[in-house]
Amino acid sequence: MPILPTELANVFPDPELEPRLQAYLDLLLDWNTRINLISRKETAPWIHLQDSLYFAAVLPPGGTLVDIGTGAGFPGLITALARPDLKVTLVEPQHKKQLFLEAAASRLGLPVTRLEARVEQGKIRATQSARVYGGR
């Protein structure tokens, strides 16, 4: 089953995206055996990946994305994969999840910024207004 939905194939025409998404999924499933990145009951983790791709498709070009509480990298890491024109920052307070994000970003060659912090700690400051998209 293809990871990239057919309706997004024209939005993300890079032929290397599909194998990179598969590499991410393989890494996610491997790490998920050791740390809880996604529910172990999850039968189709690629659904989160596809949701992230739909999100990435509507973001304006050349912008900045700050994914607060990124966990396994949804949607931030996937957005960085699909949209190299964006500056992506991944904020995750759990060290073990940060280790996964570091490994994934390194293996996939993604120039993302990672912050191991809680927003409540005040380590993140907005320097300009932002559009907010929510999930969960």
Give the location of each predicted region.
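Conserved SAM/SAH cofactor-binding pocket of Class I
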Residues: 53-136
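Class I SAM-dependent transferase core
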Residues: 1-66, 96-111
